[in-house]
């Protein structure tokens, strides 16, 4: 799916996010989505991370009320908390960010005890305290929140403006950087260089080979690394197709 982003003035962002929600929640899955925008990619990307975060706009309003007395402190932390959201799956990057965030012991206690910040959605991997701080940052950020619960990303690459939500691989391209006739070529290269993209392609090939039984792209398939796949190919030899 190719989404031309924010076509309807100031209200376009909300409508685009609602349309993206339809894409990622569709059954059977739509596996690839390119967002083509004249907006700054990081703004679009952060709005997506805010919108797809398992909590609703009303729940984020409750969080704002609960932490209103800490607003001045948290407002200063928001840039770090947004960076934490972008790098949540990178242990090295998030560790550096957390060093400054976790210096406030009283805030740690409050984040740990707040039911909305610790709410775990069925089927989502819990990130514990990390997830609580990500949600706290979203609550105090200016980015758009969803009216209804939306799934969290299962993988994020902020440097490439790429993420995976509900087994849909999404990437953001800026219109000033990439011509319309280059989209397919650039996206194809990006999938090839993106580990989870390779697994998406494998899943599509598996579905083509075995059309009965629905989609084969699930969290188990996406968690397999290219290195592990290569190892099993080497060990299985001619029987690799049967192994797959």
Language-model features: locations:
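Extended charged low-complexity segments that act as oligomerization/scaffolding linkers
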Residues: 2-228, 232, 238-239
């Amino acid at each position: 799916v190719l989404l031309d982003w924010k076509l309807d003035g100031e209200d376009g962002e909300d409508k685009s996010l609602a349309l993206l929600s339809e894409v990622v929640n569709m059954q059977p899955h739509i596996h690839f989505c390119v967002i083509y925008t004249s907006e700054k990619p990081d703004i679009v990307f952060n709005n997506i991370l805010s919108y797809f975060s398992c909590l609703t706009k009303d729940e984020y309003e409750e969080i704002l009320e609960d932490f209103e007395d800490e607003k001045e402190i948290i407002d200063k932390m928001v840039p770090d908390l947004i960076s934490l959201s972008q790098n949540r799956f990178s242990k090295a990057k998030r560790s550096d960010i957390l060093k400054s965030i976790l210096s406030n012991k009283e805030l740690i206690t409050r984040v740990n005890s707040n039911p909305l910040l610790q709410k775990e959605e069925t089927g989502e991997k819990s990130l514990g305290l990390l997830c609580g701080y990500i949600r706290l940052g979203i609550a105090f950020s200016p980015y758009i929140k969803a009216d209804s619960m939306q799934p969290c990303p299962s993988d994020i690459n902020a440097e490439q403006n790429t993420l995976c939500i509900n087994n849909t691989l999404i990437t953001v391209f800026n219109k000033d950087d990439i011509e319309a006739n280059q989209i397919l070529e650039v996206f194809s290269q990006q999938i090839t260089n993106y580990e989870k993209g390779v697994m998406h392609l494998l899943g599509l090939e598996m579905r083509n080979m075995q059309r009965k039984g629905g989609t084969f792209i699930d969290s188990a398939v996406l968690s397999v690394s290219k290195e592990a796949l290569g190892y099993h190919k080497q060990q299985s030899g001619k029987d690799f197709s049967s192994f797959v």
